[in-house]
Amino acid sequence: MSIKSPQTLVSEALNEVKTITPEEAMKLNSENKCNLIDIRDGVELEKLGAIENSFHIPRGLLEFSIHPESSYVQNNQIDLNKETVLFCAAGGRSALAAKTLKEMGFKNVSHVGGGFGLMIQKGFKTKT
């Protein structure tokens, strides 16, 4: 039996999903053209903070939370007509998550290469 490594899975996902820069994500977010979704776990948010104007949906709940019948979508917290931009700490989990959303049928999905750390370096602000 051959088991793929996480690195192989991420590499495969990166070949299938759109990767955007932190600067591109910042522009989309400032123009209110995207749902900026932080898929890091709660411990990471507590330790490092959350990006302003982002939604927190942990990776393990993403598929359930972003489905059109979910309360996030039903309560207009997430607008599925906008681009869905995912980020994690460094970009691996968000690439995998973006691939999963594409498999679910979402068309306008991307992830931020470099993740939270690079986003902070490029000027994203954290919530206080």
Model-identified regions with their sequence ranges:
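Rhodanese-like catalytic fold shared by cysteine-dependent sulfurtransferases
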Residues: 1-34, 42-83, 92-128
